[in-house]
Structures are given as C-alpha cells and as structure tokens.
Design a protein with these regions (language model features):
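GH16 jelly-roll
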Residues: 1-167
Length: 167
C-alpha cells in the first residue's frame, strides 16, 4: 500500500506522510534504494522539508548493504538527518557501529535552528564520505565530521539510502 507516498510531478516532490487508520493506529512509509543503488565514498545530498509534530520521527539515513549477513549495528548506520517531531528546529547527524569490543557505539552531532523549524522550508541535508572521514552538512555548512577510526570498518563498505517518517 503506497497511500502514504504522494508525488507532485511539477515540483519533483515526493511526500511521505503519517496517516491515521480507522482503528486509531498510524501508518507511514519508507523509501529505500536497497537492491537498486548503493554508495561508497560519495557525497549524498537530499533536499527535504521535514515534518514535525509529537510522535513523528523523520529520517534521511543509510544502512550497510550487508545488514542481512552482519545485522545492526555491525553493518553500520549513517544518519544524515534525523529529527524528533517534538523538537522541530533540531536535527541530529549520527553514526552507529560496532566498536572493537563488539558493542554498539555511536558518534552524534546536532544542529539547532534559532528562528525557524525544519518543517518551514526546504533544506539540503548532506553526507560527504571518503575513506578517512564522514562529514555531515546542512545547507552546505558542516554540522559534524567524524574520522573513520580502525574499529569503524563498517564505513569502508557500501550503503543504501532510506527516507522515512516513523510514527
């Protein structure tokens, strides 16, 4: 069921929305490039207007292609931009991985806008990734930069892109 995904052909807009069902529960959607397009050591830009509201969790993120073989967080996760709906002016950029002791580790940066919400206007959320570091950007301004350490081997492999709104 793709009813939570709509397009506006004239503006090249793809909209993911949360919808309340007759039973009172909510549904949303997830778009993924898994099995179609994967990237490694590239820059990825996504122009988006994020949703806001209590209980919503919009995200632009990537998972390692080998998630079926290694599982999370061993496959690695690159959160280009995540928001919590009750914090409409704050975005998070995070890496999740398995450290040298085989435990979940994360490195997180964030950016808070002082005068507007991420749902008020379109922004470009980016990750610029090479074999030495991963840089997160908002509207071409650096939010966080993480060197790829020896125990972060996940980030030397290919990843696929995911766009979603969790409820």
């Amino acid at each position: 069921d793709n009813s939570s995904i709509t397009t506006d052909q004239g503006a090249n807009v793809l909209r993911i929305s949360a919808q309340k069902s007759n039973s009172g529960s909510y549904t949303s959607a997830k778009l993924t490039t898994k099995n179609f397009v994967s990237v490694r050591f590239r820059r990825v830009d996504v122009r988006a207007k994020m949703t806001s509201g209590k209980g919503l969790w919009p995200a632009i993120w990537m998972l390692g292609n080998n998630i079926k073989d290694i599982s999370w967080p061993g496959c690695g996760e690159i959160d280009i931009a995540e928001m919590l709906g009750h914090e409409p002016n704050k975005m998070y950029a995070t890496l999740h991985y398995t450290n040298g002791e085989n435990k979940h580790e994360e490195v997180q940066g964030s950016k808070e806008l002082s005068d507007i919400k991420f749902s008020d206007a379109y922004h470009v959320f980016s990750v610029d990734w090479d074999h030495e570091k991963i840089t997160f950007l908002l509207d071409n301004t650096q939010v966080n930069q993480v060197p790829i350490a020896a125990d972060m081997k996940e980030f030397l492999r290919s990843f696929y892109l995911i766009l979603n709104v969790a409820v």
